[in-house]
Amino acid sequence: MQKVTIQEAEHLLQEIISEEDDRFQILIKDERKGVQKLISKWYKQKELAQKEKEKFLEMSKYENALREKGLTYIAGIDEVGRGPLAGPVVTAAVILPEDFYIPGLNDSKKLSEAKRERFYGEIKAKAIAIGVGIVSPQVIDEINIYQATKQAMLDAIANLSCTPEYLLIDAMKLPAPIPQTSIIKGDAKSISISAASIIAKVTRDRMMKELGEKYPAYGFEQHMGYGTKQHLEAIEAHGVLEEHRKSFAPIKDMIKK
């Protein structure tokens, strides 16, 4: 192989997947600083990819154990929006295929918006089934947020295109005739729950951005309904909306004034 430019070396390293590659053996002997920097970057990316693979395998242990028992339709379930002062609580139930793999999958709260959007598209394309449950602020006020979250999860299961054989749920037990395991911080321990958290989060965020367009003075597209200083000041200035949860403090105290 003739001596390549730094740019050519960069393109080659994007193609090379093993140190055994003859081209890599030539590049590693190239003493130019630019090439050595690229080699160092290649090793770091390789190390990161390995860590992501190990993390993914660790997060697949619940699903793999159930598949060993002959189960196929394993639904991960998670919610987003229990804490905000406005907007619905949104849940998702996701059934993934056995060969599903997205490196870097994690709890939706730990991912950037750009990554969540990308993963959302991949999950939608690859999942066996996805169900979403949405419960309004009015119902939350009527039955309380805990019961509303349960209801949204049951709705998400009902909206799946196939019946799950087992449920993996993030920190919740459901009154459903389906075997289930409740996992504390499940969105960081199970790929199915993690996928559900991403579907629920992106779905709810999109709804809150639409509310932001409808009520520009409230900034819903920025705080997603949570009780930030900006949000509380907007309520003081412009009043309580039908999208606000009247049973949540400080909204209920503002109504009493």
From Swiss-Prot:
Binding site for a divalent metal cation: D78, E79, D170
Cofactor: Mn(2+); Mg(2+)
Pfam families in the record: RNase_HII (PF01351)
Keywords from the named record: Cytoplasm, Endonuclease, Hydrolase, Manganese, Metal-binding, Nuclease
Catalytic activity: Endonucleolytic cleavage to 5'-phosphomonoester
Task of the protein: Endonuclease that specifically degrades the RNA of RNA-DNA hybrids.
Name recorded for this polypeptide: Ribonuclease HII
Organism the protein comes from: Bacillus anthracis
Source organism phylogeny: Bacteria, Bacillati, Bacillota, Bacilli, Bacillales
Gene that this polypeptide is encoded by: rnhB
